[in-house]
């Protein structure tokens, strides 16, 4: 019935939001600890940021797929 559909949609929204918050928290905590200084540090940092962003997107997609 309609109440169940709303509850299910809301639960999915909450799960997605929690996953996004978790990934954001991971990215924020990892960013503070990744301060390595070397000649190609900027390039390495940009690649690391890209890979972290991609991993976060993949993780959220995996959570949304319901295979957890």
Curated annotation (Swiss-Prot):
GO terms for molecular function: glucagon receptor binding; hormone activity. Coiled coil: none annotated. Keywords: Hormone, Secreted. InterPro entries: Glucagon, Glucagon_GIP_secretin_VIP. One of its GO terms (cellular component) is extracellular region. It is found in: Secreted. GO terms for biological process: response to starvation. Induction: Produced in the A cells of the islets of Langerhans in response to a drop in blood sugar concentration. Its main location: secreted. Belongs to the glucagon family. X's in the sequence were included by homology with American goosefish sequences. Promotes hydrolysis of glycogen and lipids, and raises the blood sugar level. PANTHER family: GLUCAGON (PTHR11418), PRO-GLUCAGON (PTHR11418:SF0). This is Glucagon-1. The gene is gcg.
